[in-house]
């Protein structure tokens, strides 16, 4: 009789537990509130504005995407590929249908996606609800620099679904592999991060094939492995399903063009070396320190509570740990793939702690009460200010943005004094998406879509940096792009240079920004 751990299929369920807690203790309720508090974030993501603008235009044009960039005057001939076109349309639909509460609807949508990704990621974990919720809370706390209205979270949700499917493939469910087809078909239209999903699938499949090959040569090793090992038949079915799913990703408005755009962007060394999100992990930032603290904590828990041999999981963790250290933007992916491990290690730590404590203090009710008190204290210390900001961002965004670095006051002045400015704007990189949201009639200089764009010798991001970051600023860039008005951070290097230039006059200034207009010769 075979003793291979892959033979007996397990029931098709969402992990070992239900998708929601069967009972809601005070500790569970407080943990859920803490998670909700973290997942709800105001609309301060720089790229959100252009995603919303693209979605609103998509609705207005009956789902037709523009062939070239319609939003900038600098790169209007660029063949724009919007890899999140369906997400843009969904955001715009929520925003428009809810009227004055549209921004709040978008906030709730991203909170649901964030929490959903985390809950589903922990579903395969061998852990109870308390450990899973604590793990989710810890991961969201570490991920705070990334939280908000970021379309990348659709990819994190896709990864969670993919890992859930893989869990059931491992435990013997052959037909579930065909759900990869609708998953990747939808994913490829929601966000360009579907390529990360294909890569994850390749890592899992490659590691499983390697493990199965080793087991075939040394059958005795099968009993040493602590994760289910798919047999050759299931691996063959999975390979076929993966190929069909990969082919389905061509069913987008762009076909092969989507892959071409992604490959060209990821091959752009200047962009990768310049943008913060593509740079290496650094302890100089709060986010980097939080992440390293998470890794250290995970390592300590593993030393004392992890004794399993799981080569496929190891391969996934090692690969994405390396990617997260190499590129800052990959940290959320590692947080998602490590969530089940985090929950399992916390569960093991709680069991171990209960075993070594004196009998007089082992009462689970007392420990839950103490833990609930700690979570309540954390919620109390955070106060209501955060949720108040979220609500204001969702219901009164113009008022909310007065408290941020975004130039809402200047936008309102421009609307009231449009005749005092020009027709070709220079704006800062971080303001481009915001301006497309709040000044939809204006064409911008640059935004978050454009770091890799180049037409001939015209390299917009490089030209932008020469003007905005170089000392002294390369004012000739303004002439090259025929810019006749500038919206720039007050007292910045560029603002000081324009103050000294006779051909430019300041027409507006507030505590955040200044507006300059080119003077006639």
Can you say where each PLM-predicted feature lies in the sequence?
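Transmembrane-helix motifs of polytopic, lipid-linked glycan transferases
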Residues: 108-125
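Short periplasmic/luminal acceptor-recognition loop of GT-C membrane glycosyltransferases, typified by
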Residues: 415-455, 483-490, 516
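Short hydrophobic alpha-helices at membrane interfaces in multi-pass membrane enzymes
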Residues: 168-185, 236-240, 313-318
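Transmembrane catalytic cores of multi-pass membrane glycosyltransferases
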Residues: 59-62, 192-307
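Membrane-proximal, lumen/periplasm-facing interface regions of secretory-pathway glyco-
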Residues: 357-416, 430-432, 450, 465-470
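Short hydrophobic/aromatic helix or loop-helix immediately within or flanking a transmembrane segment
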Residues: 74-101
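Membrane-interface alpha helices of multi-pass inner-membrane proteins
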Residues: 35, 139-143, 177-192, 202, ...
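Membrane-interface transmembrane helices that cradle and orient dolichyl/undecaprenyl
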Residues: 162-177, 295-305
